[in-house]
Curated annotation (Swiss-Prot):
It comes from African swine fever virus (isolate Tick/Malawi/Lil 20-1/1983). It is found in: Host cytoplasm. Induction: Expressed in the early phase of the viral replicative cycle. Signal peptide: none annotated. Transmembrane segments: none annotated. It holds the Pfam family ASFV_360. GO terms for biological process: symbiont-mediated suppression of host innate immune response; symbiont-mediated suppression of host JAK-STAT cascade via inhibition of STAT1 activity; symbiont-mediated suppression of host JAK-STAT cascade via inhibition of STAT2 activity; symbiont-mediated suppression of host type I interferon-mediated signaling pathway; taxis. This is Protein MGF 360-9L. Plays a role in virus cell tropism, and may be required for efficient virus replication in macrophages. In addition, inhibits IFN-beta-induced IFN-stimulated genes (ISGs) transcription. Mechanistically, degrades host STAT1 and STAT2 through apoptosis and ubiquitin-proteasome pathways respectively. GO terms for cellular component: host cell cytoplasm. Disulfide bonds: none annotated. Keywords: Early protein, Host cytoplasm, Host-virus interaction, Inhibition of host innate immune response by virus, Inhibition of host interferon signaling pathway by virus, Inhibition of host STAT1 by virus, Inhibition of host STAT2 by virus, Interferon antiviral system evasion, Viral immunoevasion. Belongs to the asfivirus MGF 360 family.
Amino acid sequence: MVLSLQTLTKKVLARQYPAQCHHHFLKCCGLWWHDGPIVYHQNQKKIWSSFFTDGVNINAALVKAVKENNYDLIVLFTEWGANIDYSLLSVNTECTRDLCRELGAKEQLKQQEVLHFFNMVKRDLTGSNIILCHEVFSHNPILETINRTKLRGIIYEQLEALMENTDILSELLTKYWYGMAVEFNLTKAIHYFYQRYAHLHQWRLMCALFYNNVFDLHELYTKEKVRMDMDEMLKWACRKNYNYLTIYYCCIVLGADLNKAMFHSIQFYNLGNIFFCIDLGADAFEEGKTVAYQNDKSFIASILSLNCYSKNDSLSLKETDPEVIKRMLKDYHSKNMSMAHKYYIKYGFDNID
């Protein structure tokens, strides 16, 4: 049955994917993007296309359409409620600028408007959206006009200990988006960055270790053959607490020293990691106490003085598949931490030698 234009439009607006036989009509009606139909969810204010397979905010879709100089979609998205002022973030030709003016765009965005869009769009954690964020922001001269301190504060909060001092904003932003892709295992975005930024292969490895992404760590080691000094890898894995997956992979799969992992965790004061290493078999308690005292962490030294710890035999030391490792550690709780906690509640640690 041939549907009317009105019915087709309603299907698009109601987020119903039209049948293959209707694609020609959708192309003729301008409801076509990235070699596929456009779907719009009116309540969520999100657009779906063959590129934005997980959906994207309509304002972000507008910015993408402006960047591509797609006049029909600029008009369409504006009619659907997109804020035409955000076109200023990606406009790159005078003809497109004139069209946006006709649609009501102002001459310049205020600083708070740019930061608002930045904060809004980065919360949409999909691979296609992170790629869009990189395309729009990483080399955008409009960011030179806003407060660098505020923008860097947003970036530092996300990257934490991964942050490096650099005055080159474009490089900082590229690492920021790449790091987010690895943290949330957005494989589409990860592969996008990997193919374009060969000099950031080690950055991807650092992010995989720091953000506990054992799947990406496994791919980097088995497929991409990206390498780093093993002690450096342990430092990145142990820098963040509860990084059980990447610590397990480094020590059990790749053969890193469990006691060194415990020492690094002591330096970073990450108790969860310390007890995980003990559960896996770390036993250099005297050396660990020395590291603790050297780093002014006497509480950890007291914890390590308890003579009650042993390897947790329920943890398999033979797994190499990331999926199996994740499943094994999903509900993991440290038996040695439980014993230390019970001792502390009953006796405290003040009188331990």
